């Protein structure tokens, strides 16, 4: 595989996606839009026609939003859905999207490595398992990385490329270059750490949010309202460090001395979410989460989130990370 920062011909780079549930199928859509031939593999028997319909619907929506211009069938012609690992043989890149279970992933890696070339890159979409730990399950740890996506994969600008202790950095840099063809602003995580970057930031917020509700400081609705109208207002333009620069670093320095010791640092799962899960709650999926949902409300929330993802994508593209550099050049 050519490891250069020149123009990359995505149509010559076959991509395998192993595990084609909601996330895996969304990644398939992203790769098809980027021009890759895609092999979507179901490691356990599934209704492949249902998966194809999901990808087809994603492509239809992408076309309506102007993300793609070719007919949906043009992209589907570059997609193979299968349950046969041997079909992964021509892939230069494989993305594993199976359950967050080390034993399951280890078995999947053995089957993948039995058929792909030695110079093919193998990645995992894990959001919780350290990449270095997963590298212990593969024959060629140097070519193994984390690729942490968010859903919808074909509209979000987010992607983390994570090195394990044994990853070859040059291959990670190549993945970051390739990710730009997927319409990503990739984050390169140089050192392996549990949760990577985005999850560590977000789970600190989730813990504090649960604490504020459990201790009676605010309701679920009010915590959500504060997030939507504060961080939700600026975070697409500026990350946390840029925001502190914009609004005065010295102010945050002054507040940290007194506030940081007062923040919740309990390592146990918050009672608020624990009670919901023990009662069978899954959120919108079954109508029972921090809020309750009728079937129609659940459907409309999912529909609205998808609609919002297209709108926020347009805003993110208008204000990319280098927006000021572009203005200086104009």
Language model region names:
Residues 2-11, 34-36, 181-188, 215, ...:
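NAD(P)-dependent Rossmann-like dehydrogenase/reductase catalytic/cofactor-binding core
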Residues 2-65:
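NAD(P)+-binding Rossmann beta1-loop-alpha1 motif at the extreme N-terminus of oxidoreductases
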Residues 18, 41, 82, 97, ...:
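Structural motif
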Residues 121-199:
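Rossmann-fold dinucleotide-binding core
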Residues 46-50, 61-121, 129:
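Rossmann-like NAD(P)-binding element
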Residues 40-73, 163-168, 186, 195-201:
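Rossmann-like dinucleotide-binding cores of NAD(P)H-dependent redox enzymes
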Residues 202-208:
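Structural/interface elements that position substrates and couple domains in central-metabolism enzymes
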